[in-house]
From Swiss-Prot:
Reactions mediated catalytically: L-alanine = D-alanine
Gene: alr
An MF annotation (GO) of this entry: alanine racemase activity
EC numbers, comma separated: 5.1.1.1
Pathway field: Amino-acid biosynthesis; D-alanine biosynthesis; D-alanine from L-alanine: step 1/1
UniProt protein name: Alanine racemase
């Protein structure tokens, strides 16, 4: 029998969340962001479920797009960081991948690299995030260059990215949206600005195409709301099992550093999961897991391969019982808050030794 630490991916939850997105953005095309192994949920598990139900898959790089194509998935892919060298352009066009152009060097590569077929492109403009994107005043020259290049598909898109969408009260959001909407250069035939947070908070930003990421996987993009608040269902269940149970005397120190002890006899369960699997090491006291239909608190430090839970008040729990680390019952947003981070990071840091099921 293999180690019980695993990810359970729920296709029905994925489809429910996609339905919620389409309800919030009626009539809009959907680019499903599946970069970083579908936010840790597994591109092998996610892409076939979404194939044919969306406009395109959004990935960070060529390698991620090729991995999707190798699955036999036919939905188009868009490289959101574009190409990292001119050599990648021919591979992209041969596989019908669209490329985001965000820098003059990428535009130069494109203009100087004749291609056998017209390549689909999106132009990224910087409206205030100051990370990637052309300046607004550069867009006309970019468009002129693309229009005169015979190996560029003329269905050119324009996109930007909001820096503070997860904080809807920030004035920068409306400033960026307004700047984007004021761009009147002809030739851009489709536009996109809305990520998960903007889809929910700024309907006026939805434009032609929306780009859901974290909400697709049933996780809230906001610090003060969870998946249930937004009508989303977690796609990932991070699971393990009780591998050992020990009855300890009063004041027995548990785990590295002896950071936890009880003034009465305690019953400690060992769960086969730790920071080597992607569970955060630094969590606050009484962070829960879900066992036998109830929450049980983690005690002591999280180790590389295991963590310990207090079963003193739960005598019915046995070795082999299933444990949910996060998922349907214990939302990942809660664990992220306990660890002082965000759900995105926890999903993406699941290690390779955790198997998908």
């Amino acid at each position: 029998m293999s180690r019980p630490t695993r990810l359970v991916i729920e296709p029905s939850a994925l489809l429910h969340n996609l339905s919620q997105i389409k309800h919030l953005a009626p009539g809009k095309k959907v680019i499903a962001m599946v970069k970083a192994n579908a936010y840790g949920c597994g591109v092998r598990e996610v892409a076939p479920v979404l194939d044919g139900r969306i406009e395109a898959f959004g990935v960070a790089c060529l390698e991620e797009a090729l991995a999707i194509r190798a699955l036999g998935v036919e939905t188009p892919c868009i490289l959101f960081q574009g190409v990292f060298s001119s050599d990648e352009l021919s591979v992209a066009v041969e596989n019908d991948f669209a490329c985001v152009l965000h820098h003059a060097k990428q535009l130069e590569w494109l203009i100087k690299t004749p291609l056998p077929y017209p390549i689909k492109v999106w132009v990224k403009v910087n409206t205030g995030m100051h990370r990637l994107g052309f300046k607004i005043h550069e867009l006309q020259k970019v468009m002129d260059a693309l229009q005169t290049c015979t190996w560029v598909d003329k269905n050119i898109g324009l996109m930007t990215h909001l820096a503070c969408a997860d904080e809807p009260h920030r004035p920068e959001n409306q400033q960026q949206i307004s700047l984007f909407q004021e761009i009147s250069i002809p030739g851009f035939r489709q536009r996109s600005i809305a990520n998960s947070a903007a889809i929910i908070s700024f309907p006026d930003s939805q434009a032609d195409v929306v780009r859901p990421g974290i909400m697709l996987y049933g996780v809230s993009p906001f610090a003060n709301q969870n998946a249930r608040d937004l009508g989303l269902i977690p796609v990932m269940r991070f699971m393990s099992a009780i591998s050992a149970i020990h009855d300890n005397p009063s004041f027995a120190q548990v785990g590295y550093g002896g950071t936890w002890k009880s003034d009465k006899p305690s019953r400690i369960g060992i769960v086969a999961a730790g920071y080597g699997d992607g569970y955060p090491r630094h969590i606050s006291e009484k962070t829960p897991v879900w066992v036998r239909g109830r929450e049980v608190s983690i005690v002591g430090r999280v180790s590389m391969d295991m963590l310990t839970i207090d079963l003193t008040e739960h005598p019915d729990v046995e070795i082999g019982d299933e444990v949910e680390l996060w998922g349907t019952h214990v939302l990942v947003e809660r664990i992220a808050k306990s660890a002082g981070t965000i759900g995105y990071e926890l999903l993406c840091q699941i290690s390779e030794r955790v198997r998908y099921k």
